[in-house]
C-alpha cells in the first residue's frame, strides 16, 4: 500500500491491520499514540474486527497512549452511523475527518476528547484547509443536512439492501463493508470492466484493484 509514496514520514511504525498482538509488539516507551482506520477504504474496504478495536482501546488505556481514528473516508454518515467508531462502541481520543463533512468543498477537521483539548492553545494546530469561511459555512450546512435528515440511517438501510442483492451474483467472491462503504471482490479480475459498465448506467463506483470495486 506504500508503493510509490516513499520516503514515508519518519517517526511512524506500521503494524498489520486487525492484528492486535502485532500492534502491541510495535509499541515501546516512546510510543505516544496509535492511529487506525475503522474501515480500510483504499485497500479494498476491510472493516476492523470489533475485538481488534476494543483491544486497542484497552491497550491504549493501559499504556496511557492515545488512540486516534482516521475517519476521513468513514465519517459523517457513510457507514450507517454518524461516525464509524459509533458502530463499534469504541471511543477514540482523537478523530480526523474530511470529505463528507464539506459536501464537496475542501475542508478537514480534527476532534479530540475534552482532556486532550486542554493542551491546545491558539495556533497550536494548523491545517491547509482550516478556517476558510466559505468551506466552514459549507461544512455547517452539510452537517445540518446529515443530522436533520438522518442520512446515516439511509446509508445503513440502502447499504444493507445493496449487500444483500450483491450476494446473488455468481461472479462475486466476497462482499465487505459498513453502510454504503462497500467493497465487492470478484472471482476474476473484472473490476475495471464492471466500473466502465457501471458508469454507462450512471452508477459511479471505483476499481481499487483488478478484482475489487468500491
Segments predicted by a language model, with ranges:
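Conserved N-terminal phosphate-binding loop of PLP-dependent enzymes in the Aspartate aminotransferase
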Residues: 1-214
Amino acid at each position: 500500500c506504500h508503493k510509490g509514496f516513499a520516503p514515508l514520514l519518519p517517526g511512524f511504525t506500521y503494524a498489520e491491520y486487525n492484528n492486535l498482538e502485532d500492534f502491541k509488539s510495535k509499541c515501546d516507551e516512546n510510543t505516544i499514540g496509535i492511529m487506525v482506520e475503522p474501515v480500510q477504504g483504499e485497500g479494498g474496504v476491510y472493516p476492523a474486527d470489533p475485538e481488534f478495536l476494543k483491544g486497542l482501546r484497552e491497550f491504549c488505556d493501559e499504556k496511557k497512549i492515545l488512540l486516534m481514528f482516521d475517519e476521513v473516508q468513514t465519517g459523517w454518515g457513510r457507514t450507517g452511523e454518524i461516525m464509524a467508531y459509533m458502530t463499534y462502541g469504541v471511543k477514540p481520543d482523537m478523530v480526523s475527518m474530511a470529505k463528507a463533512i464539506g459536501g464537496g468543498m475542501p475542508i478537514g477537521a480534527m476532534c479530540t476528547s475534552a482532556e486532550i483539548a486542554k493542551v491546545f492553545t491558539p495556533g497550536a494546530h494548523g491545517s491547509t484547509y482550516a478556517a476558510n469561511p466559505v468551506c466552514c459555512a459549507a461544512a455547517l450546512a452539510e452537517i445540518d443536512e446529515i443530522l436533520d435528515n438522518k442520512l446515516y440511517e439511509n446509508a445503513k438501510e440502502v447499504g444493507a439492501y445493496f449487500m444483500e442483492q450483491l450476494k446473488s451474483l455468481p461472479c462475486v467472491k466476497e462482499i465487505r463493508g459498513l453502510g454504503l462503504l462497500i467493497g465487492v471482490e470478484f472471482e476474476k479480475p473484472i473490476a475495471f470492466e464492471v466500473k466502465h459498465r457501471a458508469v454507462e448506467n450512471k452508477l459511479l463506483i471505483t476499481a481499487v484493484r483488478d478484482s475489487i470495486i468500491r
